[in-house]
Amino acid sequence: MKWVVIDTVIQPTCGISFSAIWGDMKKIIWYQSTIFLPPGSIFTPVKLGIILKEKEYPITIYNIAPFNKNLWSLLKSSQECPPGESKITNKCLHNSCIIKICPYGLK
């Protein structure tokens, strides 16, 4: 089954991400990975990760839950990445970020 990413929230200090996805129903996945799943990405879950653009990537999925608007709003409001000031300077202001390649193109 293919899943489509609707939106993603990243917590850069711990490397955890949350994505709102659409498959057979709308869901929220909580995961850790070295890749970023931007909105519009289409992937297939497999035993040890996901297949994205015909390539398999390891991913640790901690939980999958039915989409809940209130929970998603809470996750979005606590989003640390990207901070608003960074859009002006093109520099990440998070000294504790553990993500090696910024999905937002910040340095």
UniProtKB/Swiss-Prot annotation:
Cellular component, GO annotation: cytoplasm
Localisation per UniProt entry: Cytoplasm
GO biological process, one term: cellular response to starvation
The entry's keywords: Cytoplasm, Stress response
Main location: cytoplasm
HAMAP family assigned: Anti_adapt_IraM (MF_01199)
Function of the protein: Inhibits RpoS proteolysis by regulating RssB activity, thereby increasing the stability of the sigma stress factor RpoS during magnesium starvation.
Family: Belongs to the IraM/RssC family.
Protein name (database record): Anti-adapter protein IraM
Organism: Shigella sonnei (strain Ss046)
